[in-house]
Amino acid sequence: MRTRTLLPAVLTVASLTLVGCGGDGDSGAPASTSSPSSAKATASEGGGSAEVPEALRFTGTTVDGKPFDGASLAGRPTVLWFWAPWCPKCRAQAAETAKVAEEYAGKANVVGVAGLDGNDAMRDFVDQTGTGSFPHLSDEDGTVWKRFEVTEQSRYVILDKDGETVYEGVLPGGEGLSGKVAGLTG
């Protein structure tokens, strides 16, 4: 009798373990309409005004403790990379993501959005993966993850220059990221 009870529990734990860092789910379509949309507000920055899409109207703190305003991303395509420090898929994406950030510097934004752990582990991940050339938000409470309806790490949300989601999904090893950004900057 004990085996009948124990077996389903073991199978459940095993299946959750196999899921690991999340699925390889891929959605080339924009996120649902309840996520940040194209609604815009005018923000004054440096004396000028810029249209700030609703999607970019958020604030946070970087893993280095500096304030971050999503409005600073307005006007350029933006890659939001949602990762967790303990995630092997995220580590595999790090080099390609850093390469894209360098390749498209000044043409597109790349921002890491770290979650599902503490800030010390997040800083260690950035140091260990060599991804410190672009900003990483410390989203310990999941505010930015929820805003973009991200439910698992190792996902990318790519916004066009108008703040519209043009891609949301997993790119194993970051493969294909450069092509997606090139299509928005060319």
Question: Which residues fall in each region the model found?
Answer:
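Bacterial N-terminal signal peptides that target proteins for export
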Residues: 1-9
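C-terminal motif of bacterial Sec signal peptides marking the signal peptidase cleavage site
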Residues: 17-20
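Bacterial signal peptide processing site
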Residues: 22-25
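N-terminal "domain-start" segment that seeds a small globular fold
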Residues: 32-70
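Hydrophobic beta-strand anchors of alpha/beta hydrolase catalytic cores
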Residues: 79-80, 110, 156
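Structural microenvironment flanking redox-active thiols in thiol-disulfide oxidoreductases
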Residues: 91-129, 140
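Thiol/disulfide oxidoreductase modules built on the thioredoxin-like
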Residues: 127-132, 140-186
